[in-house]
Curated annotation (Swiss-Prot):
Keywords: Ribonucleoprotein, Ribosomal protein, RNA-binding, rRNA-binding. PANTHER family: 40S RIBOSOMAL PROTEIN S15A. GO terms for cellular component: ribonucleoprotein complex; ribosome. Part of the 30S ribosomal subunit. Contacts proteins S5 and S12. Belongs to the universal ribosomal protein uS8 family. One of the primary rRNA binding proteins, it binds directly to 16S rRNA central domain where it helps coordinate assembly of the platform of the 30S subunit. This is Small ribosomal subunit protein uS8. InterPro entries: Ribosomal_uS8, Ribosomal_uS8_CS, Ribosomal_uS8_sf. Signal peptide: none annotated. GO terms for molecular function: rRNA binding; structural constituent of ribosome. Pfam families: Ribosomal_S8. The lineage of its organism: Bacteria, Pseudomonadati, Pseudomonadota, Gammaproteobacteria, Vibrionales. The gene is rpsH.
Length: 130
């Protein structure tokens, strides 16, 4: 069976791993998944990530907890293969009143909604993280 939406699979693995109190989750790697993991680490939502293997690389994400509760309360896919969602810089959403982030794919790469607004860029809304 082929995977239709690898980004949704990644977000689901992170969500399921945190609800099961796992230390880390593994998944097949891609450039986009690594970029999303790097953004989540920079924003403080995950502890670390690493890419292992040469022929079939695997992405391992080390999950982060605070006082035995997951740091990521909500992670939700927005733009999907059947319905792409694009927004201009002035219409980028604010997640949980600015407490969360929207991961935006812009012409300058992946960035948070705050960074995209500051740079004056719009793009595809990949997911919401809070």
């Amino acid at each position: 069976m082929s995977m239709q939406d690898p980004i949704s699979d990644m977000l689901t693995r992170v969500r399921n791993g945190q609800s099961a109190n796992k230390v880390a989750v593994k998944m097949p790697s891609s450039k986009l998944k690594v970029a999303i993991a790097a953004l989540l680490k920079a924003e403080g939502y995950i502890a670390d990530f690493a890419v292992e293997g040469d022929i079939k690389p695997e992405l391992e994400i080390t999950l982060k907890y605070f006082q035995a509760k997951p740091v990521i309360e909500q992670i939700q896919r927005v733009s999907r293969p059947g319905l792409r969602v694009y927004k201009k810089n002035d219409a980028l959403p604010s997640v949980m009143g600015g407490l969360g982030i929207a991961v935006v794919s812009t012409s300058k790469g992946l960035m948070s909604d705050r960074a995209a607004r500051k740079a004056g860029l719009g793009g595809e809304i990949i997911c919401y993280v809070a």
